[in-house]
Every structure is written in C-alpha cells, then in structure tokens.
Amino acid sequence: MSNIDLSASSNLNVENTLVPMVVEQTARGERSYDIYSRLLKERVIFLVGQVEDHMANLVVAQMLFLEAENPDKDIHLYINSPGGSVTAGLSIYDTMQFIKPDVSTMCIGQACSMGAFLLTAGAKGKRFCLPNARTMIHQPSGGAQGQASDIHIQAQEILKLRERLNEIMAGHTGRGVEEIARDTERDRFMSAHESVEYGLIDKVLERRVGGE
C-alpha cells in the first residue's frame, strides 16, 4: 500500500548539518553533549522537518524516556514541520495522549498539515506559537497504483483516515467535524493569531515570561 501523506506540497528535504556541541564542567571533569541532547535534559524535544517513520520513532522514544525520568513534569515539543506521513504522525499523537506528563507544543517557523495536527494535540492551555509562525491544515493525500480493486481499497482507506483526523482535530479545536471537513478541503493557511482564533493553539508567545 502506498504511503498516505499529510504535508505541504512545497516541502524541502532537510540536509544534515553540523550539530553544535555543548561542553559542561562536572565534578568528574568535562562532559560534552550535542545541543539537542542537552536540551533533552531540560525536557525539550524538537520535531523538525518531514514527519516520517524514523523521525517519529525518535520523538516517541524521547517522550517515553522523559516520562520514565519524571512522569509529573511537562514535556516541551517544539515543532517546525511541513507535515508528512499520517501513520508516522499518528504514532506521535497517540504517544502524546498515552503518556502521563502533559506535552506542551510550540510552533516555531511552520506547523503545516501533520505538523499542525500535532501542534493542536498538545495539552489544553499549553499550545503556543511564536508571533511570525504559520500553520496550515488540509486533507490527507496519497498516490495509488495497481489493479482497480486495489486503488479502490486505498481510496477507501484515505477517506477513513480523513474522517478520523477530522474527528480528532474537532475535539482539540472545539470546532464541529463538518466545519473541519470544509476547512480542510483545500490548503488553509493561518497566522499565529488566526491559529488562536481557530482553536489550533491557546496563545501567541512574543517573549518568555516566568516559567514559560
């Protein structure tokens, strides 16, 4: 079966880049971390680029690790993604709902398609965008090939997934399922403040305040 995708059509492949290292002094001497591992110690997870199986497995593993480390402390998920695979995204979504800690979500840059779906899946009251971030919602898409009967089966699967995604998004945004279905017929782009009005997020953060 072909992979069903929920992503912005203009996405770009993210090239591997040099990851900065952080050196800390400890009682046992110097210890170095890559920047993402150091931020993981602060319970920060980055969801960056295309949502696909390998990336989803890493995000899920990090959430499970942080839950085991402290089940009562929030996890902070920073999202900058054009979207991607529906099944990979749903594995992240289900884990967010399954684990004990609240998962706070923050859009930096863009949260499109499956990225927007995961953004709105954060704990109520803890879903944020930076002021110039953009979000976009639309319906899933997928390519099908083979015999006519196979194409029909795959088309039915896409329709079932679309219905389920609309139901989930309706629950998180407070919108009706029919309204979500209409709004996702085509690409719907929103600014950070429009995302608040729609119910995708709870607040636009312009500056860190207190424990935010």
Curated annotation (Swiss-Prot):
GO biological process: protein quality control for misfolded or incompletely synthesized proteins
A GO molecular-function annotation: serine-type endopeptidase activity
Any matching Pfam family: CLP_protease
EC number: 3.4.21.92
Reaction catalyzed: Hydrolysis of proteins to small peptides in the presence of ATP and magnesium. alpha-casein is the usual test substrate. In the absence of ATP, only oligopeptides shorter than five residues are hydrolyzed (such as succinyl-Leu-Tyr-|-NHMec, and Leu-Tyr-Leu-|-Tyr-Trp, in which cleavage of the -Tyr-|-Leu- and -Tyr-|-Trp bonds also occurs)
GO CC terms: cytoplasm; endopeptidase Clp complex
UniProt keyword annotation of Hydrolase present: yes
CDD domains cross-referenced by the UniProt entry: S14_ClpP_2
Annotated compartments: Cytoplasm
Residues at the catalytic site: 113 (nucleophile), 138
Top EC class of this enzyme: hydrolase
UniProtKB keywords: Cytoplasm, Hydrolase, Protease, Serine protease
Superkingdom classification of source: Bacteria
Protein family (similarity comment): Belongs to the peptidase S14 family.
Protein task: Cleaves peptides in various proteins in a process that requires ATP hydrolysis. Has a chymotrypsin-like activity. Plays a major role in the degradation of misfolded proteins.
Assembly notes: Fourteen ClpP subunits assemble into 2 heptameric rings which stack back to back to give a disk-like structure with a central cavity, resembling the structure of eukaryotic proteasomes.
Protein name as annotated: ATP-dependent Clp protease proteolytic subunit
Originating organism: Saccharophagus degradans (strain 2-40 / ATCC 43961 / DSM 17024)
Organism classification: Bacteria, Pseudomonadati, Pseudomonadota, Gammaproteobacteria, Cellvibrionales
Gene that this sequence comes from: clpP
